[in-house]
């Protein structure tokens, strides 16, 4: 299989390594040409994804910012083989899929929205690894929800990544859920670490601090774009969370033991309900 990858960051680089390890031919387009040259010299990439190689690709994986993915697809759609499968790896789906599904229909190739639920607090090719996706969930947004043949084709194409599970959803539901499960934790972590007390945490912090602050180390440009593209869903979760925090704040301010125990017990029971 010939695989084309757009972007050589953590996700794109890990995809390249996984497919190369599985014996496939890998072409990559990357803004940083020096990094692309390094990847080629290191054997992680076979060559550049460009006008001559795009038509050769059986699978195209788009692993840059949402607008960049759509812009590239609009510019190169006419070069893509009608037998090719194109999957994006962006953290939002409505904006991407609403523009890419019509493109695929117009030019005859197949586009499926994708979101690999794997990552790291670090970004860039130097942190990429072939095993990044091993056992991780993959969310799929197909153009037709119940096309089992297409879903099997996608699973087969992604086999070298080693995903542990596949979830199929709509673009709207994806963005609603991802605001809660991914985007909100990044906001909370990033805001929490700004406390002036954080400067003196060493010697006083353990697992809970590490868990809460891990994703504060993020890519500001990328996450800002994701938050704004998913603005309504993120604001819904933020408003709910802020209201909830105010209840804890008021109970502590009022020294209201009963209310505080009630709030904590509600949270404990909700965790048991959703993850028990």
Where are these regions (language model features)?
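NAD(P)+-binding Rossmann beta1-loop-alpha1 motif at the extreme N-terminus of oxidoreductases
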Residues: 1-51, 55
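Short phosphate-binding/catalytic loops that engage adenosine nucleotides
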Residues: 24, 44, 109, 163-164
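Short beta->alpha hinge that forms the Motif I/post-I loop of the SAM-binding pocket
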Residues: 31, 64, 89
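Alpha-helix C-terminal capping/helix-to-coil transition sites in glycosyltransferase folds
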Residues: 55-56, 135
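N-terminal Rossmann-like NAD(P) cofactor-binding module of classical short-chain dehydrogenase/reductase
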Residues: 60-61, 87
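Rossmann-like NAD(P)(H) cofactor-binding subdomain of soluble oxidoreductases
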Residues: 74-126
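Internal alpha-helical scaffold of NAD(P)-dependent oxidoreductase catalytic cores
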Residues: 130-214
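Interdomain hinge/lid region at the active-site interface
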Residues: 200-270
